[in-house]
Amino acid sequence: GFIAATSGDESATGSSWAPFAPTSDGVDSGARQIAEHVGRQYRLPTGEQIVAVTGGPLELQGLPMKIAVRKSVADGGEIDVLDGKGVLYRMCGLGPDCAIVKGRPTPERALLLRREALELALYSFHDLDDVEHVVVFMPPPKGEKPSVALHFGRDDVAGQLARPLQATLPLPVPNPDTITTAPNTPAVQQLTFAKLFRFSLTQSNQDTSVFLVLDPLPTES
């Protein structure tokens, strides 16, 4: 439903930016509400929800995660350890290892899930307190382990946050059959393609934290 503005600062409310806003700006319950709301919007042509989405702080089994981005040799080959509060979303298709059991794995479906990840990120930066990073674990192909994530920094989407959500992600929400002709899909492709990474987790040897290692995906020639 439509949420009325509760203060003079409209940019901080759900009403002017998007019809939905979580009732909490914390990374626990706020991210959980965003995950539930966004997850229900994305469906197969049959009407079935594609993935279950969970959200919360950037941690693994209670241990905080530090993001370490390994750049390709072409981009300098450095490792950047990123600071700032983060949110972690997980998309699960409810098959083995969270693979999607319904429908066919197509490039269109993958693009639709990237649109969903972008929507999760935009809500998180707009509505949650002091979030600087959003990581979304994507569902794997059948027979594989989850290995692909999207990582967004707040600055990556500053332009989108300054406009209402529907300017970036117009309604109605597309499905795998309609995503390629949906308004603004080229912008979604551009905003998300460079944010795809192969992820791995490794325990830090210095403290009780975990490194979330993000490696660039091999580019298709």
Explain the meaning of each model-derived region.
Residues 73-75, 117-122, 135:
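Residue-level detector of functional hotspots within protein domains
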Residues 110-127:
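Long, charged/polar, surface-exposed segments that mediate recognition or autoinhibition
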Residues 122-148:
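A short amphipathic beta-strand at an alpha->beta junction
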Residues 1-115, 141-221:
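Bimodal "functional hotspot" detector
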